[in-house]
Amino acid sequence: MEGGLDTDASVHNNPLLQLDYEPAFASLGDDYYDLVAAAPFPEHRLRFRGDGVLRLLGLDPATVGEEHFIEAFGRFAGRGPFLAMRYHGYQFGEYNPYLGDGRGFLYGQVRGLDGELYDFGTKGSGTTPYSRGGDGRLTLKGGVREVLASEALHHLGVRTSRSLSLIETGEALWRGDEPSPTRSAVLVRTSRSHVRFGTFERLHHFKRKDLIQKLLDYVIAVYYPHYGAEPERYALFYRELVGRTAELAAQWMAVGFTHAVLNTDNMSITAESFDYGPYAFIDRFDPGFTAAYFDHYGRYSYGNQPLVCRINLEALQLPLSMVIPIADLEAGLAIFDTHYAAHYTARMLAKLGFGALGPVLGPELVKATLNYLEAAQAGYHGFFQALAASFDRSWQSDQGAIPAPVVGAPEAFELWRESYFRALASLSDSELLRVGERLNRHNPTTVLLRPAIEAVWAAIDQNDDWQPFYDLIGRLRKPYAIA
């Protein structure tokens, strides 16, 4: 296990409790949250610890033992009460005014060595006023899945929350969508913010312009401080959020990730991927792939994600328009498509081995690649892995030497091969030398596909064997052939 377990660690002078917690969100006042306590749990077994996050927070992992984690993030001793954040949201296009932190809370906020303020948020820590009849708990499998998602995405270069700890809590839970009874856990994750689009939507629902402006001032001061007292800071904030969200959508699409539940309450005001439920990485390239069994109409399908992000940003205009002129909001949203296209094209070209190829050649190659993948019903990651494994510089002078990375769709393959050859032919000798390196640097050899997750869970569920879980995490942290 990462960092090892020190069962003799003293709970005195707990480094996790001695962090310099800042009352940033708490200082806004109780119009934005409810004070809650953590649930008591019968058992505490540390199953995962995020030593990389500890280092970001300025802690030496060797000084933080198992009992420190259990005391701080299992028993929740030494701090409290905690903040259950209030928000609403559009869920599958329908407005839901009955949301809020239903099984978690804001534990605290700590500034990292990078100068950014990080929220510690919990999942499975007990009931709150927003539990809506639920038990406030997290299944152990759900916790395992979230740890794996955040580790995978972080090391693929996607802006994401990080898992700080996963503690099994010894309760039997009943769920309608998985075999029950099932085991329980509590997760602590770090995120740059847990303020959601839905946080603003709730305030608009109650017609509280004053609270929207107060929250805007907080968000800009804490997360967009470069705008300072700029008279146009509100409009500039929204424009930057649009650009960041477009980039996040491009990151998801390039790595083949389907979030599955892109409701506005799952959209972060810092454009960070978080709250991992029925997510999946695509295997076969299929824009219509849906990861959630309850997404009957494919609203949050893999291919719809950029559009949904744009729709959610447009929905955010309604509450923000109480403070920001609608013309400024519309101008901000107008950059989404070009920002998304630029970031997505750049990432896909890198996966194909190229840097910038120009405004025509680059997009044409990406389009030909996607057409080929879809026509061949090819494995998305396997295609790029095969391309990386077979690449040869001689292809630049011999189009016929370029082999098919996947089987099927011969007509689409010929169109792709012609486009790939034109791209290679445009390169200088020095640029050609970098193609193979880029192919290996940008195409992971380890991808978090569903069979890998299920194999890890089967070992835990049937034999309480955690080694496959830790082994998979190790591979996810080094996903590329070239670091």
Curated annotation (Swiss-Prot):
Mg(2+) binds at residues 266, 275. GO terms for molecular function: AMPylase activity; ATP binding; magnesium ion binding. Its EC number is 2.7.7.-, 2.7.7.108. ATP binds at residues 100, 102-103, 123, 135-136, 189, 196, 275. The active site is at 265 (proton acceptor). Keywords: ATP-binding, Magnesium, Manganese, Metal-binding, Nucleotide-binding, Nucleotidyltransferase, Transferase. Its cofactor is Mg(2+); Mn(2+). It catalyses: L-seryl-[protein] + ATP = 3-O-(5'-adenylyl)-L-seryl-[protein] + diphosphate; L-threonyl-[protein] + ATP = 3-O-(5'-adenylyl)-L-threonyl-[protein] + diphosphate; L-tyrosyl-[protein] + ATP = O-(5'-adenylyl)-L-tyrosyl-[protein] + diphosphate; L-histidyl-[protein] + UTP = N(tele)-(5'-uridylyl)-L-histidyl-[protein] + diphosphate. Belongs to the SELO family. Nucleotidyltransferase involved in the post-translational modification of proteins. It can catalyze the addition of adenosine monophosphate (AMP) or uridine monophosphate (UMP) to a protein, resulting in modifications known as AMPylation and UMPylation. NCBIfam families: PRK00029.1. This is Protein nucleotidyltransferase YdiU. It comes from Gloeobacter violaceus (strain ATCC 29082 / PCC 7421). The gene is ydiU.
